[in-house]
Amino acid sequence: MLSPRASVYDAGALPALTEEVELTQALIRNACVNDGGTNVSELPNADLMLAILDGTTADIEYFDAAPGRRSVIARLPGTDSTAPTLMLLGHTDVVPANPDAWQRDPFGGEVVDGFLWGRGSLDMLSYVATMSLAFRDYAAQGIHRGGDVVLALVADEEALGSQGMGWLQEHEPD
């Protein structure tokens, strides 16, 4: 049986941080905090994702459900319109953090002893980074058999979702 630390990313074993870790750090440092109020913005993370996907063969759209509430949808059309679609779904907002309750800056994105510290590093910015880079790299291959592959990076998951996935379901169901 593996110990809980057996699968920990060992930053010291690599000559430099991976692109996935660096992108996750950038997403954390953007501090797209969603406290459920009106002064919320996922624009920094959404715009960073748009920059990552720029230049791919994907059909890329973004939707602003409200000022600052941007969701990004990228689609790679498949070769079989009857095949199921694969959706990679993530959210770009995080819940608030009380800095006094943290051992490190919750929005510092530091790697210390092989651990990435930061609000959203697990839920769900590391997944957003990894999925986005995998999608970008898959798009670069230029071979898209089967059904469509969709990357959906939504705003407002941490509160009600009404300005993220809920808004997309109502206004952009395709």
Protein language model regions, located:
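Structured beta->alpha junctions
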Residues: 64-66, 120, 157
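N-terminal helical capping/dimerization or prosegment-like subdomains
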Residues: 2-99
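Active-site catalytic pocket residues across diverse enzymes, especially alpha/beta-hydrolases
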Residues: 78, 138, 142, 172
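Short alpha-helical patches at coil-to-helix transitions and adjacent helical residues
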Residues: 46, 124-128, 162
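Predominant activation on well-ordered alpha-helical scaffold segments within soluble catalytic domains
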Residues: 25, 50, 129-136, 166-169
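Histidine/acidic-residue-rich, glycine-tolerant segments that coordinate divalent metal ions
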Residues: 146-174
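Active-site metal-coordination/substrate-binding segment of hydrolases
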Residues: 83-152
